[in-house]
């Protein structure tokens, strides 16, 4: 029975990749106007994203078995799927091929696709692809758009505090968003900063950490976008759009039109 189940999941994963070849998806993304090559992202920003999301990214083959086992044990204890144990490669697979359904069969297919992505794309292109489609809350996908949305400045002008702030958003982009929920985000930021400081070779020095800690929830960063009608109203439409069309509805450049009420700000992203 389990063998047949595995064969079915494997066949499903193969069909998805045949319909939407990973390399073709990657090349299509590089041709879009908001594409940001990995080489244009500050090296420290990349290091922070990798360290906080998947510290073993450069050594695993797409799947971290220890994290998967830990997630399964915690989910069994919670009696529902709460923890994913996902690597960066698995998150890329989820963003490219799956809707927001949470079940073990989808996770199994996600694992198989992640293993295939490692072979077909390699680490550099996976990371390049990842930073261009990762969700940063408020309907913002991709690092380039996130920098413009949250700080209104070019990537090259980011401060260390802003880099760290952006690196902390992806794990909880909605419920821990720094604009709508600054107090929640502050707790997330502090936990992650302490995690990095405990490393044998921390990416952030004690002096730099003290500077980041100086920003509390009342001012996470002086340049951070303030709450407005757009950030208050627009996120309410995201669950509807994702449920109706899926996360990858526009991944090939197809237009998706959505109309807002007159009270919604017309400030552009």
Give a label for each model feature.
Residues 1-269:
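Juxtamembrane regions of bacterial inner-membrane/periplasmic proteins
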């Amino acid at each position: 029975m389990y063998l047949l189940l595995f064969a079915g999941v494997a066949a499903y994963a193969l069909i998805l990749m045949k319909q939407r070849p990973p390399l073709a998806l990657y090349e299509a993304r590089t041709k879009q106007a908001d594409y940001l090559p990995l080489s244009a992202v500050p090296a420290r920003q990349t290091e922070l994203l990798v360290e906080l999301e998947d510290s073993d990214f450069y050594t695993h083959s797409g799947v971290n078995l220890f994290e998967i086992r830990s997630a399964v044990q915690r989910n069994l204890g919670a009696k529902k799927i709460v923890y994913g144990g996902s690597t960066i490669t698995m998150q890329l697979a989820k963003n490219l091929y799956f809707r927001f359904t949470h079940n073990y069969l989808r996770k199994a297919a996600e694992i198989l696709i992640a293993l295939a992505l490692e072979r077909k794309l390699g680490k550099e292109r996976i990371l390049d692809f990842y930073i261009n489609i990762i969700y940063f809350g408020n309907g913002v996908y991709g690092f380039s758009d996130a920098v413009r949305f949250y700080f209104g400045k070019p990537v090259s002008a980011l401060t260390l505090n802003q880099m760290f702030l952006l690196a902390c958003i992806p794990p909880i982009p909605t419920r821990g968003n720094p604009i709508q929920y600054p107090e929640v985000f502050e707790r997330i930021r502090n936990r992650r900063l302490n995690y990095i400081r405990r490393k044998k070779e921390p990416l952030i020095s004690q002096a730099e950490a003290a500077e980041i800690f100086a920003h509390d929830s009342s001012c996470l960063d002086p340049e951070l976008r303030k709450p407005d009608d757009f950030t208050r109203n627009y996120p309410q439409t995201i669950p509807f759009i994702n449920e109706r069309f899926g996360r990858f509805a526009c991944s090939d450049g197809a237009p998706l039109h959505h109309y807002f009420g007159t009270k919604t700000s017309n400030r552009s992203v």
